Amino acid sequence: MASQGTKRSYEQMETGGERQNATEIRASVGRMVGGIGRFYIQMCTELKLSDYEGRLIQNSITIERMVLSAFDERRNKYLEEHPSAGKDPKKTGGPIYRRRDGKWVRELILYDKEEVRRIWRQANNGEDATAGLTHLMIWHSNLNDATYQRTRALVRTGMDPRMCSLMQGSTLPRRSGAAGAAVKGVGTMVMELIRMIKRGINDRNFWRGENGRRTRIAYERMCNILKGKFQTAAQRAMMDQVRESRNPGNAEIEDLIFLARSALILRGSVAHKSCLPACVYGLAVASGYDFEREGYSLVGIDPFRLLQNSQVFSLIRPNENPAHKSQLVWMACHSPAFEDLRVSSFIRGTRVVPRGQLSTRGVQIASNENMETMDSSTLELRSRYWAIRTRSGGNTNQQRASAGQISVQPTFSVQRNLPFERATIMAAFTGNTEGRTSDMRTEIIRMMENARPEDVSFQGRGVFELSDEKATNPIVPSFDMSNEGSYFFGDNAEEYDN
């Protein structure tokens, strides 16, 4: 890991702050989520939502999307320059669900972007509060990570669909800043780079001229972000090669895919944070909680505690299982989509089932779905224990994994061995160790072969009772290692389509 001196904690990235001490970080993160809460309350007032309607997660998502769209400078500029039929570039909106005569009805609302921006700034002491916007993007990204699999996207870039544990944050917009970069998985970064290189191969002007210079800077920056996620010297050296390449082409794509595969065993450091829907912060603010004064952390007990006493509802389709819908949202809140299911189950206190066994579709309701048959139910978002979210890959060791997902990317800092199937992973490394990166490749393969299943990651780290806010008594769970470990095992989840 890089010396702590140069690293900002993710709360600092998220709040755009320079180095702060723990109290200042807690206060600025508190200010950020408090601003989201105040904005949400104001929007509910504007839209005349009842208390129940304001607690509906689908309404929360619509309101979040409106503010993200209102502040999307690039897209707004594009929409103004390329007017398309039926799209007013100055307006934003979406479906709002209301309870009428015992039924749920959908109402499509439209708002001036300028007005939404005004309400957002007003809730955030007159500032743009980009940190809060990024926070909402990460919540949407975590929701996508829990809901969809990215098989098609992986295959398109030449990667193996079983590498889905590396794909955290793959739906985050480009403008999500440092906090967004911190939560992106190795596979996500590799995919972005491969797409860029492919464009360069197909379009000879891509790296040329004034625009090309900017492209090159973006390329090198992305390489550096990815390099920073790797924890071994050989992986980092390979990233230097990719970054310094004169004109990136197929050799670089090969190197990147090699690195992505290696990350299944030599895991990268990927940040995890609990980002909750805006309505949860709104509920807390409405009940008089002062986030800035009390302080808040995205990686400690605070989100767990907030969810313990928030009642959030969701629309449920006729044949969906409300308990499964709750699991989906719980996973989206704490971002363990690629975590070992046994760890998630232990913390949640109820069994977390693999994606393929869930009787539920995504949280968002399509505009053509019939509202007549929609019901709503309370989401069970409480947990039995809490654990600190990690930003390391928890590297030391490995062990058996499953067919649908051949590795995990730990979310919680809890002692265990990390499951993965060495035979499957190593099979991908036959042959090709020649070329400029041969010595590094050989070194990486050697490290992977020497990784021992019996070693334990996060030694001595445990989960904590919800009454133990200072994390003084770690409970180190023992896991039944014969059990299935991965969420996307044997999966038939829907694909994510933009």
UniProtKB/Swiss-Prot annotation:
InterPro entries for this protein: Flu_NP
UniProt keyword terms in alphabetical order: Capsid protein, Helical capsid protein, Host nucleus, Host-virus interaction, Ribonucleoprotein, RNA-binding, Viral nucleoprotein, Viral penetration into host nucleus, Virion, Virus entry into host cell
Residue ranges of the motif Bipartite nuclear localization signal: 198-216
Superkingdom of this protein's organism: Viruses
Pfam families (alphabetical): Flu_NP (PF00506)
Single GO MF descriptor: structural molecule activity
Intervals of motif Unconventional nuclear localization signal: 1-18
Region spans: Disordered: 1-21
Record's comment on post-translational modification: Late in virus-infected cells, may be cleaved from a 56-kDa protein to a 53-kDa protein by a cellular caspase. This cleavage might be a marker for the onset of apoptosis in infected cells or have a specific function in virus host interaction.
Record carries keyword Transcription: no
Intracellular or extracellular location(s): Virion; Host nucleus
Any single GO CC term annotated in Swiss-Prot or TrEMBL for this entry: host cell
GO terms, biological process: symbiont entry into host cell; viral penetration into host nucleus
HAMAP family the record matches: INFV_NCAP (MF_04070)
General function of this protein: Encapsidates the negative strand viral RNA, protecting it from nucleases. The encapsidated genomic RNA is termed the ribonucleoprotein (RNP) and serves as template for transcription and replication. The RNP needs to be localized in the host nucleus to start an infectious cycle, but is too large to diffuse through the nuclear pore complex. NP comprises at least 2 nuclear localization signals that are responsible for the active RNP import into the nucleus through cellular importin alpha/beta pathway.
The protein's assembly and partners: Homomultimerizes to form the nucleocapsid. May bind host exportin-1/XPO1. Binds to viral genomic RNA. Protein-RNA contacts are mediated by a combination of electrostatic interactions between positively charged residues and the phosphate backbone and planar interactions between aromatic side chains and bases.
Recorded family membership: Belongs to the influenza viruses nucleoprotein family.
Protein name in the entry: Nucleoprotein
Gene name for this UniProt entry: NP
